[in-house]
Amino acid sequence: MAVARSKLLVVEDNRETQLIIKVALRDSYDLQVVNNSNDAISLLLNNSFDLVLLDLNLDGKDEGKTILSKIRDEMKNTKVPVIIATAYDLKPEDEQFYHENANGFIPKPFNKKDLLGIVNKVLLKK
């Protein structure tokens, strides 16, 4: 009997970064990739995921915080692990929120090894 592959939602608006993520993770995980907060929230409301890889800055806005808040407060799967991917330093006023609500962080740019490492680590803790 085949082992089910973990299902990951990737929320990333940069096409180049999407490609890096797909190449790094597609052999090990089932990926659903979206590039905006509306699609992410819709998928999260109607599907179950084993992990969310979330870009904080979507279309030049801090949409990641909104998505993470909705995951933790409103979704049926509020315990889904979330890894924050960002090229920016966290705002001091947001640091505590992210540390309390995210399960991991990966700075951009990242490589395949680092991305696989954090995803595997967070999924093993699940």
Mark where each language-model region is:
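Conserved acidic carboxylate
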Residues: 12
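Two-component/phosphorelay signaling modules centered on CheY-like receiver
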Residues: 15-32, 37
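C-terminal output helix
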Residues: 110-119
